[in-house]
């Protein structure tokens, strides 16, 4: 079991992270809609940067990125494993702006969903397979034409660390149809 120090730091992170998230979510609701796209991404990601900083300071999380040279400016499809909330946050900082394919229910979450909606994600109803694929292909093509990278978690939901789920083909199909690289 985790030590008491780890437990206390984890609870402290959770409390601070959520308190700042509520305040920032309200600010996003009041200010974010009026900002141009690039400023909106930077504004929303203030909370993300804070969360990554807090993880490092409070919980000792260190980040090392290998292969950053493979990331380019402009349109591409990023296919990523989904093991926790962490990678969704960090990818927002690593590649911004971006359009993330996500389940629409995330946008219904108070505060968090309000900020997320400002990033113009590709919303899908995971219960409707064909309609979800159509949304990814159509909305993804629009974002790519605008020069915005698209992030897809092809397993559809979180997987246990070290395991791989079934990869849906929407990301590769989107990249092939739009002749953009896959990272």
Model-identified regions with their sequence ranges:
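Soluble catalytic domains of membrane acyltransferases
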Residues: 57-183
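A transmembrane-helix-recognition feature enriched in membrane-embedded lipid enzymes
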Residues: 3-64, 114-118
């Amino acid at each position: 079991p985790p030590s008491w120090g780890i437990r206390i730091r984890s609870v402290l992170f959770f409390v601070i992270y959520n308190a700042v998230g509520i305040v920032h979510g309200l600010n996003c609701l009041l200010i974010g809609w009026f900002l141009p796209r690039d400023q909106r991404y930077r504004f929303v990601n203030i909370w993300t940067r804070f969360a990554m900083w807090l993880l490092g300071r409070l919980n000792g999380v260190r980040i090392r990125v290998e292969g950053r040279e493979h990331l380019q400016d402009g349109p591409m499809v990023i296919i990523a494993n989904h093991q926790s909330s962490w990678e969704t946050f960090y990818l927002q900082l690593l590649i911004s702006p971006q359009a993330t394919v996500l389940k629409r229910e995330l946008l219904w979450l108070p505060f968090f969903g309000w900020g997320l909606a400002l990033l113009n994600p590709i919303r899908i109803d995971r219960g409707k397979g064909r309609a979800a694929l159509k949304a990814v292909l159509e909305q993804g093509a629009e974002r790519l034409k605008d020069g915005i990278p698209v992030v897809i978690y092809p397993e559809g939901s979180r997987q246990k660390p070290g395991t791989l789920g079934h990869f849906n083909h929407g990301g590769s199909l989107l990249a092939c149809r739009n002749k953009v690289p896959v990272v």
